């Protein structure tokens, strides 16, 4: 497990406006908790704590939306 910005396909972070959205998103995928990191490295994006290794996280490099 690890902490990180949960990722959409193509290395894009999930944008957010509130903690409830991120907590639901993160815990649905097995994380302990999640919150909306306001004005973080990737803008307002969901950060997950103790996210399972099989769930993709945002890594350095460009976001390539479909």
Swiss-Prot record:
CDD domains named among the record's database cross-references: neurotoxins_LC_scorpion (cd23106)
UniProt entry keywords in alphabetical sequence: Disulfide bond, Ion channel impairing toxin, Neurotoxin, Secreted, Toxin, Voltage-gated sodium channel impairing toxin
SUPFAM superfamilies: Scorpion toxin-like
Cystine pairs: 12-63, 16-36, 22-46, 26-48
Top-level taxon in the UniProt lineage: Eukaryota
Gene Ontology annotations for the cellular component aspect, listed alphabetically: extracellular region
Record's keyword annotation contains Secreted: yes
N-terminal signal peptide: none
InterPro entries the record matches: LCN-type_CS_alpha_beta_dom, Scorpion_toxin-like, Scorpion_toxin-like_sf, Scorpion_toxinL, Scorpion_toxinL/defensin
Chain ranges of the LCN-type CS-alpha/beta domain: 2-64
Spans traversing the lipid bilayer: none
Molecular function terms, GO-annotated: sodium channel inhibitor activity; toxin activity
Family of the protein in this entry: Belongs to the long (4 C-C) scorpion toxin superfamily. Sodium channel inhibitor family. Alpha subfamily.
Function: Alpha toxins bind voltage-independently at site-3 of sodium channels (Nav) and inhibit the inactivation of the activated channels, thereby blocking neuronal transmission. This toxin is active on both mammals and insects. It can be considered as a cardiotoxin, as it can bind to human cardiac sodium channel and modify its normal properties.
Comment field on protein domains: Has the structural arrangement of an alpha-helix connected to antiparallel beta-sheets by disulfide bonds (CS-alpha/beta).
Protein name: Alpha-like toxin BmK-M7
Organism: Olivierus martensii (Manchurian scorpion)
């Amino acid at each position: 497990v690890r902490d990180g910005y949960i990722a959409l396909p193509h290395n894009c972070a999930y944008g957010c406006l509130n903690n409830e959205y991120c907590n639901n998103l993160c815990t649905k995928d097995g994380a302990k908790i999640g919150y909306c990191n306001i004005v973080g490295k990737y803008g307002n994006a969901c950060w997950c704590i103790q996210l399972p290794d099989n769930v993709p996280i945002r890594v350095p490099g460009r976001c390539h939306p479909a």
